[in-house]
Amino acid sequence: PAPAPHGVVVKVMANGVCRSDWHGWMGHDPDIQLPHVPGHELSGVVEAVGKDVTKWRIGDRVTVPFVGGCGICPECHTGNHQVCDAQFQPGFTHWGSFAEYVGIHYADVNLVALPDTLTFDTAASLGCRFVTSFRAVVDQGRVSAGQWVAVHGCGGVGLSAIMIASAAGANVVAVDISEQALALARQLGAVATVNANQVADVVEAVVEITQGGAHVSLDALGHPTTCFNSISNLRKRGKHVQVGLMLADHSTPAVPMSKVIANELEILGSHGMQAHRYGAMLAMIQSGKLAPEKLIG
């Protein structure tokens, strides 16, 4: 492709695949119009630069959030590019990175420079699951040391959240139906695990482990059951963060609203992360507090 005046073309060096891609090729995403090129977890090198781009040069090593902002709408003006009114999503609203080259719009707003010490493979793995989890745990959940955090679903997003919450000093309880996933969760910092297929009541199990309920709980899977359990296992005034996508038949889950009201619970969404927040995450990676390469399979 040729770069837009405000965009760049990136030579793709590495890609990731995630559940959002699955939703796309299953037809759950109305933004996708065929023919289409998916791919939104990417890293690479700037190959061409649009005439209005000021911050980037050919040869720069870069990655990009999977939700990009236009830089001029009201949400972007408040720094919330991840909910931009005219958001750009490679692989969804536009052709993506499952190709040799990909066009990235609004480059001065959305591109992220990669440290020389970060490999392209690791950088691509940050693109969706890790940055999504970082924002969910750090910015939305506001997790702090000593808190109890429950993570429902130990796929890529959930395991990333476990690593990040543990690095923040939280006590993490991981919930899944796979013993293999739960074993990996323990390796990444979970202090307790719950196999949802082996307990009578997931909510009771988490409340017992946390001695009253989690301060913060994440549904990292995106299913009516995990959403309900995540809200229900909170202690009073706790925070539920919905990270896993809930599309198609799962888009209108039951919510224990009486408990939300009586216990003053917070229900928060989390949708990607802005390019300007990558610095905090990359600093933790470079210091050794986070090791996303452990999640590459």
What are these regions (language model features)?
Residues 1-15, 28-74, 115-117:
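Glycine-rich beta-strand-centered segment in the early N-terminal region that forms part
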Residues 55, 70-152:
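NAD(P)H dinucleotide-binding glycine-rich loop of Rossmann-like/cofactor-binding domains
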Residues 61-62, 116-199, 204-205:
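Mid-domain Rossmann-like dinucleotide-binding core that forms the NAD(H)/NADP(H) cofactor-binding site
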Residues 243-244:
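Acidic carboxylate diad motif detector
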